[in-house]
Amino acid sequence: TVSVTAGNSATVAPTVTTQPDGTVEIIVTSQTAGTSTVTASINSSSQSRNVTFVADVRTAQIADLVVIKDGSEADGATANTLRARVTDAFGNALAGQTVSVLADNGATVAPTVTTQPDGTVEISVTSQTAGISAVTASINNSSLSRNVTF
């Protein structure tokens, strides 16, 4: 019987039994993106290896949309700013994801923006129309909207 541990919130069976040829198969699962160190121990001997888990792009969602700067002049050049954060279903940041952006009331935004390594992206909004503009960030079937004022 071999004892098994794993770091970074990864899950393993606490013990596994050797096959007739002396090998074991260790199944490691995780909902946390990143590197997990898996250690197998028997008697006073142990070996460790790193395994890597990546965020699940299939479950990309807009986890957060926050207004960073509001109340800019309606001059078509001075921007209000929002920050969107994209994660998978387990809250792992997703880099390199394309977020669709819309704004109403005549406001102008880039139609798509791409997330940074931490899963965030800044959205700049300009307008020549004074008033409230709803800004919507979307990915897959997930979207959030926030109002900004010019």
Where are these regions (language model features)?
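The feature marks long extracellular or luminal low-complexity segments
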Residues: T1-F150
